[in-house]
């Protein structure tokens, strides 16, 4: 970032709306307008790929595809592909503050299939003018490197009751050319459906991004370093990963015990075969980052430290304690990316156990790292205390992996930590503890400060997005539209402007005093006399 600014972390899934989950529709545009009113410059989101078991956006079944749940149904209706009665009366959940992913899975695809049936009535045909011709063929052409394999993967997966691809019949699991061709021939309509879903996602996303950019808002996206074991990428590109001839991972990803989890984190993602990537000059990574930069303005790369050294866990282990550190590609990867793509607007998530070699890689890359206030209260002059933040970093009170500030203060801090927080941040009841902590982040030297929407709303643990190591109850929280008030936007704008992260609010013009209403003129004695004597004079004149 070239100047001090600030933004809000708000997952697309957490946007308000009536259909079970946030989408790329009017509520997203309303949130962009809220950001503008609040003087913000950046909208940070979580990964937008399709989710699967566990609902985690960091365990997507594709490194390139978009989440079908985010497709706005009202927009499909406006495009003539749905009727409001196709979806408006469906039960999308009983609690509008949380996503019910099981219900979404049961009902969303049925609605999207109705839209696809309408789309087929306007099927793009080369040489004919239809509403979708140009956009459809442009999309399928530009997505040719990943879309066919993704559609094939999803169609086969559905045919096999959504089971992991490693359990499919061997000819399909191991991509026998004859078996794949027979499947394509017999399931052409199903392949078309999955392509249609991705087309609609791309169309709506680009329209939303264009709207945000037109308002001066940059979108900071997020890509996980790894892909899921059960993904189109792993199935179609086994050579990219440490896998045996049957497609089973030899080792899997995770991280050692740390602040978040005493047993470490066993993610289960297949590890990259970095030797293969080096031989191909990181072509797959170039495609992946190019795609990400086509949908985001700024790119946060999760688990940056894994490019220096990564935690490799034997497949089959029950936790992450048995892993060991292995050497990653380092600057070799980022040099290849810069050669192919030019300047890289990347933010490095450099949290967790950080070695000197990771710090050296971050410095050589030139990417800003991250600082998190919730890691700071250890009784020392911690580098995570805001006065120690370098300018070239992104400052957070907490991330999606942390509790909210209120939940953290109430449930996770010790009396000593609360005492330190009160003294360091000069917390007062009048200002409020949460506002005081946010003040500390905004006042820091960091060029960019990002605050979660839940923290601006001063929510408790009920609004936490993710608890690492806990497989249930994550990624569900949603904001209520009524909470995004002009008063809150003004507070955010005032605090951001106070620390030169936003333009000052225009001063209210002083109220002009109303001029006193004109009073009727007082009647003079002469006027009264004139009025009194006038009838007498008239009578006298008549008598003559």
What residue spans do the PLM features occupy?
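Catalytic domains of carbohydrate-active enzymes, especially glycoside hydrolases
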Residues: 27-51, 295-296, 441
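Outer-envelope exported proteins of Gram-negative bacteria
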Residues: 46, 218-220, 224, 298, ...
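Intrinsically disordered, polybasic Lys/Arg-rich low-complexity tracts
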Residues: 510-544
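Alpha-amylase-like alpha-glycosidases and glucanotransferases acting on alpha-linked glucans and related
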Residues: 1-4, 11, 17, 54-198, ...
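Mature N-terminal, pre-catalytic/accessory segment of carbohydrate-active enzymes
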Residues: 1-38
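Surface-exposed amphipathic alpha-helices with a cationic face
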Residues: 36, 205-213, 338, 362-363
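Conserved, well-ordered alpha-helix/loop/beta-strand core segments that scaffold catalytic motifs
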Residues: 194-227
